């Protein structure tokens, strides 16, 4: 059985079939860029954004896509970008007062390949010059999404010469007007319309002008249903694709349009419909129907969807933005005040959120850590460690009767006792555990989700959720094959230097760089500033078209201008945090989940769903609970003061180092501490 499975998996990988419609014609690789197709983003990213399906080389699936699906993905992606752009402009209107101008809609995809023919055959008529031109122009104006294959316009050789009053006899002619298109050449609707109009002009030159009065009777359309099919617009729920449309006339001059509708668009019987008889299979990707996100477990998706029905009841007094919780609103207020209350103890760099500070502190790998004697948690500064130690020294008279935890307040004990209850409102579907809040359940579900299912193909990072990967992939495409868009006028360029040359025009006019929004002192400094963009590394924003000179400038821009966009990534699966320090711990774990590699699965906190203000567990138990350590491993008597805690930490660290490397190896640790003190005193 295992051998058959391996054989089938190998056949699936090598099968030359379109991964999305299962056709075997006109295939191309998903992972190789087609130079004839101008795209707004690479194809795997478009597929992820539209279908929530991640494709990458070596994923065990067919690696091909047909031409029609390729164009449809490009069209859908452009449409999605247009919708998001419209949403942004509409939300900016209350703040700016500038009503946005209409956006340009993406053109419908059109493919033309040379295999079949479109025949326009005029029969006997008194006006051989008028009918072909009218028919072609009508088709050029009305056809919206017709797959035309190798167009030929033929004049019948059986035209009978007739003499019309005031004109010369029409000679007998036998000409063929043929327009061939190379295989797999992509043409837009404008190209097709122009092509048909040119063909009509050629026909007009071949025939002399005939007075209008010579044709009092207009030809009758015999099959109006075919006309309706040709003219069917994009608003139709299911638009049939047409192959080989033919325009014919009978002996009386009446017009008939004969079309062949592709079999895949005809109504199917239930027994022939693959979707009716398809067996449902389990999948590890559960896309949200209300947004572009997807999740590895169905229950995570259900928790996420709760936020689509929640109301934003906390409104900012300085602008019109609203938030789910007081904590979100407090974070947003930093944008207006400019306050950055969380400072690094090593380099004094300031941040608006403690989670960003914790992420930054991990970069100081060469600085000795101060270890808490109670829980062995490391800190970069003695002050932080002493403040943390005070929490362990609190009197906690309220002890749980089931476990060893104790609490400083009775309310904390009552909240904790719900943990031991077997009738909690949020049960896990994969085990017998249940939880008091949806956020705690979501964090527990990470253990069931297994490994991170979405690895990046360009670097070593991997992600638990598809939209985390999608957001990360934009950082690669901004510096590779993606088009570069001017933030001022939205003109796009395929080359970064071309964009900079264009941006120089805007910067000269306004003395403000359109790339990084920096105000330039004078016109003489404009060119030198743009040269810095050419020579320095590019730090592209994931949410807009700005590109900055340094990572610091980019981070400041995101914190100031994209607070709303960052909310879905910062707040999912998070408790309200209105209690004493509860949010800080969760934010720190969230950063580990999204940015760190090779971390134990139990330490992950899944991506935020928005603050869990729906539920009442506002305090984290770790803030006021304390579990006495086992007597063999830790000291049961707490130190009398914080200074004694520091001395014990130093002594214990020195003993550890001595045991591992020798008696004299403990000295460098204290030497680093002295260097750290000198650095602080110098500052």
UniProtKB/Swiss-Prot annotation:
InterPro entries recorded: Zinc_finger (IPR050331), Znf_AD (IPR012934), Znf_C2H2_sf (IPR036236), Znf_C2H2_type (IPR013087)
Major location (coarse): nucleus
GO biological process, one term: chromatin organization
Region (Stabilizes interaction with Cp190): 95-165
Composition bias type Basic residues, residue spans: 668-683
Keyword Kinase: no
GO (cellular component) term, any one: nucleus
Zinc finger (C2H2-type): 286-308, 314-336, 342-364, 370-392, 398-420, 426-448, 454-476, 484-506, 511-533, 539-562
Highest taxon listed in the record's lineage: Eukaryota
Compositional bias annotation for Acidic residues: 610-624
Function per UniProt: Insulator DNA-binding protein. Chromatin insulators are regulatory elements that establish independent domains of transcriptional activity within eukaryotic genomes. Insulators are proposed to structure the chromatin fiber into independent domains of differing transcriptional potential by promoting the formation of distinct chromatin loops to form topologically associating domains (TADs). Recruits Cp190 and cooperatively binds to chromatin promoter and insulator regions to exert transcriptional regulator and chromatin insulator functions.
Comment field (misc): A pita/spdk mutant was first identified in a P-element insertion screen for mutants with a mitotic phenotype. The highly condensed mitotic chromosomes characteristic of the mutant resembled the pieces of fruit in the British dessert known as spotted-dick, after which this protein was originally named.
Protein name: Zinc finger protein pita
Gene name of the record: pita
